[in-house]
Amino acid sequence: MRASDLAYETLRDEIIHWTLAPGKVLAEVELSERLGVSRTPVREAIARLVADGLATQQGARATTVSDVSLPEVRHMFELRRLLETAIARAAASADQMHREPFVELAEAFENAARRHTLESEPYYQLVSQLDDRLDQAGQNSYITAAVRNLRIHLQRVRLMAQDDPDRLRASASEHAEIARAVANGDPDVAQAATTLHLHHALRHILDHALTPAFNAAIAADHERTCDRTS
């Protein structure tokens, strides 16, 4: 692996997992020493992070980790809904060969939903398998490219909220409905199930975000809503 790729993947993962917090300055000298590479690969990695939207150029020289605001989260989910419902419809409209794997996936999610204890890491690996199968069955490279870029930010947003066992089981049931609808070749149900899942996923993040700045933004938004309705 090239030094710039290694630096990029390391920094991207640290941003996604909140090891590098929003506003943190990405200083080339400090990072090159910590990562054990020269400044040029670090500079290239930072440029890629800026292009991804995970870092923000502040003036001529300083680059910081991008923040995640309440409007941005809602915009992400608005785009996610458009992309993922389109993928779900396309997958459910695909031929039997492309839809066959969703039978097994639906069963796997149904089994997960019945478990008393559902570990998050294996569960999200199963979700990733479903995403990959939907991308393949949807057979639209442009939508796939767009949603894969968005998933980088969505993973970061998901980690803002602590996993809840009840929510994981509910999410498993929702994913089972999506997979079953695709397996049955029902685009309308696949779209509706995807829309419902995304509504619940966004609600969970808004209700359980752990970052103080984000919680403050949610509280302010709630106060404005109350003012408008009073």
Enumerate the language-model features and the residues they cover.
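Flexible, glycine- and charge-enriched loops at secondary-structure boundaries
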Residues: 4, 120, 164, 168
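Amphipathic alpha-helical repeat elements characteristic of tetratricopeptide repeat
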Residues: 5, 81, 103, 169-173
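Mobile beta-alpha loop/short-helix "lid" or hinge segments that flank ligand
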Residues: 51-56, 150-152, 167-169
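C-terminal regulatory/effector modules of DNA-binding transcriptional regulators
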Residues: 34, 164-230
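Conserved amphipathic alpha-helical segments that form helical-bundle/coiled-coil interaction surfaces
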Residues: 97-160, 172-184, 189-199, 203
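Short linear sequence motifs
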Residues: 1, 70, 95, 102, ...
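Short linear motifs at protein or domain termini
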Residues: 1-93, 207-230
